[in-house]
Amino acid sequence: MRNAFISGTGSYTPPDVVTNDDLRTRFGIDTSHEWILQRTGIEARRFSAAGVATSDLGLEAAKRALENANLAPQDLDLILFATLSPDHAFPGCGVYLQEKLGLCDGANAKFVPAMDVRNQCSGFLYSLATAHAFVRSGAAKHVLVVGAETHSPMLDLSTRGRGVATLFGDGAGAVIVSRTEENRGIGEISLGADGRYADVLSQKVWDIK
């Protein structure tokens, strides 16, 4: 029986550690370490340097996942990139990651399908389920799934924005979902959504400045 399992994992966070105290001393936010820690459990987050894109973070995580799985980029059959902070409105980060992995270079070129999944916090789970389905169906042997965000450039790093600015940072994680004939791997996946509450937390495109 054809099964799917996670053959490799990788993660990456930028080197700039921003502590709760840094939010006050570096950015002038009226807050404190104790206030944030008590309400969120967060002690620190990472911020990317200027010019570092979400696909750059995804690349580092992807390289580590490939190494962990003992695979090369050319072994991949599909790239899935989950993010709500892409490099551009379009195209998606997946095609940028494909190029950065060297899959568009000369004799090593392998133009595998690459697509983004934009489903907010659940995007990585939906991507993992999609990878699972591709592998189980026989359409792919190795699928790269990346979840990455670069939220720091969009944060209101002021006292006015502290309700959100204290929560988010930048980073990436990646897994390789691979085929196996052994009786092991990812079990049954069950996804669901409830559109009745879609407007409870939303941002309309035309509201984005």
Q: Where do the language-model regions lie?
A:
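Phosphate/pyrophosphate-binding loops at sites that engage ATP/ADP/AMP, CoA/4′-phosphopantetheine
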Residues: 61-77
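Short glycine-rich or small-residue beta-strand-to-loop segments that form or flank ligand, phosphate
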Residues: 77-84
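Condensing-enzyme catalytic core mediating Claisen C-C bond formation in acyl metabolism
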Residues: 1-50, 159-209
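Conserved catalytic cysteine-centered active-site region
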Residues: 30-56, 84-142, 148
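Flexible, glycine-rich active-site loops centered on histidine and acidic residues
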Residues: 136-171
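Short, active-site-adjacent cap segments at secondary-structure transitions
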Residues: 13, 86-88, 151-153
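Short beta-strand segments
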Residues: 7, 82, 118, 143-149, ...
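Short acidic, glycine/serine/threonine-rich loops at helix termini
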Residues: 17-18, 90-92, 154-159
